[in-house]
Amino acid sequence: SLVGSEMCIRDRRKTTDEYLAQVTPTRKNNYTGLLEGYNLITICAESFCPWFISEELTPTLYKLSHTGIIFDNYYGTFQSVTTNGEYTMCMGLYPDMSRTKTDSSFNVAGTNYLPFCLGNALREKGYQAWGYHDYIGDFYNRNITHANMGYTFKAADSGLDIKIDWPSSDLEMMEASVDDYLSSKEPFHAYYMTFSGHYQYNWDNAMSAKNRDAVKDLPYSEPVKAYIACNLELENALAYLMDRLKQAGVADKTCIVLTNDHYPYGLTEDEYNELAGQEMDLTFEKYRNSFICYVPGLSENIVVDEYCSTADILPTLLNLFGVDYDSRLLAGTDVLSNGVHIAVLSDKSFLTKAFRYDAGTETVIPADESIAISDEQLEAYRLYVDNKFQMSSNIVNSDYYAHVFGKASSGGTLEDTVVFTDITGIFNQASVLYMYRN
């Protein structure tokens, strides 16, 4: 019943209020505002992994991976389901894992108040924000969800003049989109959800077939060659992007961020090992991936060895771009801060510098024999991860940000909302959440 669901929303909000009042926020740090005023291009790359990158075959990806801020211990949280990985990258929250693809967290968030998504956050700072996807806009309802994140959104059948294929061309998407934001005097943020890397990995894949010649002499099996070939379309898109940024005179002030939506599940384990050139441990290392954060013009690279994963990208970027946000309201952690650094996988397994925890078998694997992990330590981390998932579900299912910031909400009623008088702007880092207890 409607009354029941309103009660449920109220309970969720109350529990979340109480939980957040106990959480220690991360502080501003030396990297706060480092990229203020830079343009930002973020890319959620379909089935991406770093193992095919080389200076010879993919010079642009190689350059992007080795220039700027280098995250040495980054793990993509998800095994499969694009919408979950994309959601986590965009929201800094975990999806409600009890939801299905068709009833995803993204769908629910399509009507929620989302102040921390990069599109909305950077628009507040005077940026224009564009979003693109090279498949149809109705797929996963991106035309609704991405507009709600602050993007002027275009997809292959809605505003983006490209051929729809299986998969479509990331290069064509790039060619059809860059003029939107390069023609403006304002700083810009553009977000891309790519498609060319989508399985199946054989020569019926339109992008694998297109780039087949470039991989024909590589020493791999056909599926691995086909995987690399379709990902060369992403490389070509990025090469084109870099050229256009240079021509427009904005290359030296544009940060480019790229990560995967999920592990390339279209490859068998043997094929993935073949591509990686090593036997990957299936619990943890197969999720090792890239959080490319290309920043031109630093005097030297910033190398970060903290363990981190998909949800950490948003808070890290908000901090770098000088957006004030209350760090307690996101599940991820700014990787450059002094917070708790942990790489989290979708089954709640996790990795830290000291140990790894396999949730499936409830096994602890210390980083080396000299380290003893106490039950209390393990329990503290397990609880930390559980809480982040629970908090994330509560936030999406109760339109929690609308409640905190006193906004009208489709998820509850205004009577449910507490208006905080000490908030001057939506990003005020006042301790807004030491809140009412009822």
Annotate each PLM feature.
Residues L2-I9:
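Short, small-residue-biased leader/transition segments that mark boundaries at the very start
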Residues E18-N438:
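Solvent-exposed soluble domains appended to multi-pass membrane proteins
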Residues R13-D17:
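Fold-level signal for large, globular catalytic cores of enzyme and receptor domains
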